[in-house]
């Protein structure tokens, strides 16, 4: 699939933007109920998780502090999986934990890759310093 090699940075950037945007929506939903979720009466762990979803997702989306934000998002989803989903079954398909597992692994990949130099605040600030 050599034809994808020339657009690899753009594909990675598009993935980063979309995944960050989708993740931030979970935080918005927790805090404000904007997508049908229940806002209010959150315990401390849900407040922390919602804050990481909202802020971390937004940072990943815009490409600012991408590696740190993606790592925090990955850890948050790993905690969500093991605290809330794992007790309902061994496999993600059994315990409705597929989304948490996929988010955790995609964010870990993005933490390893970083903003990747295109379509990010990090890349625009790096080029302005040169």
Task: List each model region and its residues.
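Extended, low-polarity transmembrane helix blocks
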Residues: 1-32, 46-51, 55, 62-130
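Structural signature of hydrophobic alpha-helical transmembrane segments
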Residues: 38-48
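Short, flexible helix/strand-to-coil boundary loops that buttress conserved ligand/catalytic motifs
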Residues: 35
């Amino acid at each position: 699939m050599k034809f994808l090699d020339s657009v690899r940075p753009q594909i990675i950037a598009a993935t980063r933007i979309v995944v960050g945007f989708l993740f931030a929506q979970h935080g918005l939903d927790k805090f404000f109920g904007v997508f049908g979720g229940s806002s209010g009466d959150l315990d401390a762990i849900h407040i922390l998780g919602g804050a990481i979803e909202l802020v971390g997702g937004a940072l990943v989306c815009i490409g600012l502090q991408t590696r740190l934000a993606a790592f925090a998002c990955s850890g948050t989803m790993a905690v969500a999986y093991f605290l809330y989903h794992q007790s309902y079954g061994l496999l993600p398909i059994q315990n409705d934990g597929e989304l948490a597992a996929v988010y955790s692994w995609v964010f870990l990949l993005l933490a390893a890759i970083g903003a990747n130099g295109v379509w990010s605040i990090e890349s625009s600030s790096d080029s302005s310093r040169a």
